[in-house]
Amino acid sequence: FQETMTLERCRFFSQKYPENTLIAMDGMKVVGFISYGNFRDETIQAGEIIALYVLKDYYGKGIAQKLMKEALTTLEQFSEIFLWVLKDNKRAIAFYQKMGFTVDGPEKILELGKPVKELRMVCSSNKDS
């Protein structure tokens, strides 16, 4: 199920954001992807990590870090880059914090069969570092 979900999500995001989706492959197998672009809240001039997903079997191999670094480099013209993460996804929150993101307050409810909370995180660029 997880692999099918990844492939379906990858297809969705690569079609919705074709110029802004990077895909990680292991041979002919999609093992992860990241989609990014302008922040979807048009009142804020910023970048956004729209989706990041890596198959569980590939955790700890640096794939998410490589995808994130590439997306952040592409979005470096923005002073802030936002993302939304499931509040209960401690592993993802820890990863994003390691990549320089911090929780900045706003939460929203996402309907995934049942309501789940998402937290907004932000990474502010610091050209001096």
Model regions: which residues?
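Acetyl-CoA-dependent GNAT
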Residues: 1-57, 68-74, 126
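Flexible, glycine- and charge-enriched loops at secondary-structure boundaries
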Residues: 3, 61, 114
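Short glycine-aromatic motifs
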Residues: 19, 100-101
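C-terminal "cap" of GNAT-fold acetyltransferases
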Residues: 46, 80-93, 97-99, 105-129
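Conserved glycine-rich acetyl-CoA-binding loop
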Residues: 51-69, 86-94, 98-99
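Short coil/turn segments at alpha/beta junctions that flank glycine-rich nucleotide-binding fingerprints
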Residues: 61, 77-79
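Short, contiguous strand/loop micro-motifs
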Residues: 72, 79-80
